[in-house]
Amino acid sequence: EIAQCLVGSEMCIRDRMESLKNNGIKAKMLVRDKQTDQISVVRLKSNWLQVWKFMWERIVIWSANRFRRYHLFDVDIANTGTDITSLPEFRQADVIHLHWINQGMLSLNDIRKILTSGKPVVWTMHDMWPCTGICHYARECNNYQQECHDCPYIYKGGGRKDLSYRTFRKKQKLYSYAPIHFVTCSHWLKEQAQTSALFEGKSVTNIPNAINTNLFKPMNKKEARAKFMLPEGKKLVLFGSLKITDKRKGVDYLIGACKLLAEKHPEWKDSLGVVVFGNQSQQLQEQLPFHVYPLPYIKNEHEVVNIYNAVDLFAIPSLEENLPNMIMEAMACGVPCVGFNVGGIPEMIDHLHNGYVAQYKSSEDFANGIHWILTEPEYNELSAQACRKVLGNYSESIVAKKYTDVYNKITGKYA
């Protein structure tokens, strides 16, 4: 039996920990912010010093931006964190598995201590940060493929030896201490990582996120709508995000698509509605030509399952994505999705088979996708195919088996 210590954001790894435990892996999770009462989830000590560490990282970024808030929370430099190597959970583990460790959780120096402990390390990438200098998504910038500098996330493009350059060089040195087995959640992210100069000669495996298919599954649509007082006779499109107005979530393209649909299909004005859940969801009521049903951001997973089951389509106009859990959740509930051709989205949605992959940043094609799904005569088959895709690729047992293979491989190598 392998004892494992998972380190990172609880939201990213809680389901994965449960699936590993169900497959014979003894797992403990170290988190900064604990959201459950599970004893296998251990919260790192929280005090004024931890708050100061988080603030200090932001102050350094703020000063690099000439004391402007420019991209202040879009980058991380991991200059502060918590040393976990003396904790019993660390000492008892055979494998250390890092996940999303930013914003004051682990510093690069803390990771160096983990690497020099001699324990094998797996690091699941939830974005590009491990393979770039300071950014989580490089967008059009390719500097990380040779060496980060003149960073577009720094005010006026930084400079030749800016914060991105200095952090990139620190990561280069860090990765030389001991092997790290990197895991990406999508083929797209694996391709990006393998082009990085930081990952030259590094092991990278692609393993998708897992989903609890016993929880996320098709249910009675009429009953689901009744729980949120949604109308029975309308076609409903769902859009959701932690922060609705976040430009990266592409809400402007959804607004554009809906306006095009209203122009081309005026008969839809009374037969189509948009369910919006997330913080600031009310702001869309004045901007969409269809009736909007705003819901707050919901954390309770059982309620989230009901929301998916209440709608006919999930729209995700995001401009940056790895392997979005919300697509997985919607498809598991039998809800076809429309998303842009970006990141890992086209790996999840099979175009015209279980959903629609729209041309990047095209409101017109996004509108085409919404129209195609809502008018598809074989909608029930489309829905069934969405379910099958998740069951065949993202179920907990399938993903846990892939991770178990990685653990067995690296513990054997280090034995």
Regions found by a protein language model. Name each.
Residues 1-7:
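Single conserved hydrophobic/aromatic residue that forms the stacking wall/gate
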Residues 231-249, 255-259:
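Conserved donor-binding/catalytic core segment of Leloir-type glycosyltransferases
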Residues 265-271, 276-305:
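Nucleotide-activated donor-binding/catalytic signature segment of Leloir-type glycosyltransferases, i.e.
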Residues 306-311:
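Short alpha-helical donor nucleotide-sugar binding micro-motif in glycosyltransferases
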Residues 319:
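Aromatic "clamp/platform" in nucleotide-sugar-dependent glycosyltransferases that forms part
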Residues 336-339:
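Short hydrophobic beta-strand element within catalytic cores of glycosyltransferases
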Residues 351-352, 356-363, 372-377:
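Conserved acidic donor-binding segment of nucleotide-sugar-dependent glycosyltransferases
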Residues 365, 378-393, 402-405:
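A short, well-ordered alpha-helix in the C-terminal region of glycosyltransferases
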